[in-house]
């Protein structure tokens, strides 16, 4: 997993328990491809992982390598 600086800052703002749930879900997706994933509209190849009230926006390239762009509360994620 590779976090952009803004995504790293997003994770640091989240409480520890929730951040650990998010990191565990990302690791699980990277290893198995399982999780609440949705391809975002447009031609960017960006994916969304839902973990509770949080949304993680990322690209997977190559398979198993995740480039995390943002970790946002759902109230902010779709603006």
Where are the model-predicted features located?
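Conserved N-terminal entry element of GNAT/NAT acetyltransferase domains
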Residues: 1-5
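Enriched for short, Lys/Arg-rich terminal
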Residues: 6-9, 13-20, 34-35, 47-54, ...
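A short, surface-exposed loop/turn module that caps and links secondary-structure elements
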Residues: 24-49
